[in-house]
Amino acid sequence: MAVDANKMTSSNGCGYVDGTPRLFIRIESAAVALAAMIAYRQLGEPWWLFAALFLAPDLSMIGYLAGPRVGALLYNVVHVYAGPAILVGFGFLSGSVIAQALASIWFAHIGFDRMLGYGLKYGQGFAFTHLGRLGFRANRQSASP
């Protein structure tokens, strides 16, 4: 079975997920976001806190002021599930409801981002992600033969 290299890499050589696997990642991410919101609700913390902190992980984009490689690294460190997983583990072990709530917000944020197609970044720039290049024009170009 031949693999079409054009379906596996973008024009800059960065690999990305395409087709059905990309759709499954987006559906899975929506499920993570929903589960995180349900967990947050069960913890009984105020929704104003959820709203106030939901976009906090995006403060990592300030790293792009130091260049695309630093920006991508900082963004990716904050946008992988390992961070909130460690925090929720700490919350369970210590009995800290606030740690569990913060982890739920963080999980929800990452899931929501991935559901919308915002993936982990490559060092070439913010628009280059593991879920494809961001932007309507970029996606239209990659979809054409």
Language-model segments: which ranges?
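N-terminal membrane-targeting hydrophobic helices
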Residues: A2-P145
